[in-house]
A protein has these predicted regions:
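Alpha-helical transmembrane segments in inner-membrane proteins
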Residues: 1-126
């Protein structure tokens, strides 16, 4: 599973770099990873989830929120003709906004929730 996940991230990064013509573009700089972290934090701290199965709640939320970020970026391109630099700047803004929200949730989280959030954000496969 780890190999498939790593390969998917590599392909996603390569596609983003090719589409925007910038070798510095990645899921991190476009805010996709931060959107996923926000979704996971919502599932862990606020227990808000789009699915009722508690084992899939974190993953489903992370996936949904990363798709929301991708949708925002795609809509930016449909809105008007924008440069690759604008995509990157919007992605960086999304990264900081999502990071601020996650940090606020960490402040109000219990010790068990903090532990689970840290465990997930470090890349746990379980």
């Amino acid at each position: 599973m780890a190999i498939v996940g790593g390969a998917a991230l590599a392909i996603a990064g390569s596609l983003m770099q090719g589409c925007l013509g910038n070798p510095l573009v990645s899921p991190l700089t476009l805010g996709v990873a931060s959107g996923a972290a926000l979704g996971a934090a919502l599932a862990i701290v606020l227990e808000f989830s789009i699915v009722s199965n508690s084992e899939l709640a974190i993953v489903a939320n992370a996936f949904l929120f990363s798709l929301i970020v991708v949708g925002v970026i795609i809509q930016l391109g449909n809105f008007r003709s924008v440069s690759a630099e604008s995509y990157i700047l919007v992605g960086i803004a999304i990264t900081f906004i999502a990071g601020a929200i996650v940090s606020t949730m960490q402040y109000f989280a219990t010790d068990a929730q903090l532990s689970q959030l840290a465990h997930w954000s470090f890349g746990c496969l379980l």
